[in-house]
């Protein structure tokens, strides 16, 4: 499903989000969302990626998960 390059790219972006590099990090606590997204990427779990996409309150995290879904050509929930 995912190449090692894709995993590296996604996990790097998650690290940036965890470091608070994105604007809505200060508005919302997305720690749990990031934890589950990271797990979904490591385990290549489409279900976890879709769940984070559908349930997060963070617009930037939603956009990021949407990008993953589109890049992997999987259907959203």
From Swiss-Prot:
<keyword id="KW-0338">Growth arrest</keyword>
<comment type="function">
    <text>Acts as a host growth inhibitor by inhibiting DNA-binding of microbial histone-like protein HU, thereby preventing chromosome segregation and causing filamentous cell morphology and growth defects in the host.</text>
</comment>
<keyword id="KW-0131">Cell cycle</keyword>
<keyword id="KW-0044">Antibiotic</keyword>
<keyword id="KW-0945">Host-virus interaction</keyword>
<protein>
    <recommendedName>
        <fullName>Inhibitor of histone-like protein HU</fullName>
    </recommendedName>
</protein>
<dbReference type="GO" id="GO:0042742">
    <property type="term" value="P:defense response to bacterium"/>
</dbReference>
<dbReference type="GO" id="GO:0051726">
    <property type="term" value="P:regulation of cell cycle"/>
</dbReference>
<comment type="subunit">
    <text>Interacts with host homodimeric histone-like protein (HU) hupA; thereby replacing dsDNA from the HU-DNA complex.</text>
</comment>
<keyword id="KW-0929">Antimicrobial</keyword>
């Amino acid at each position: 499903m995912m190449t090692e390059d894709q995993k590296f790219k996604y996990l790097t972006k998650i690290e940036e989000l965890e470091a608070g590099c994105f604007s809505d990090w200060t508005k919302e606590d997305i720690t749990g969302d990031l934890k589950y997204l990271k797990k979904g990427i490591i385990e290549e779990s489409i279900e976890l990626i879709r769940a984070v996409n559908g349930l997060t309150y963070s617009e930037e995290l939603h956009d990021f998960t949407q990008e993953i879904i589109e890049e992997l050509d999987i259907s959203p929930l």
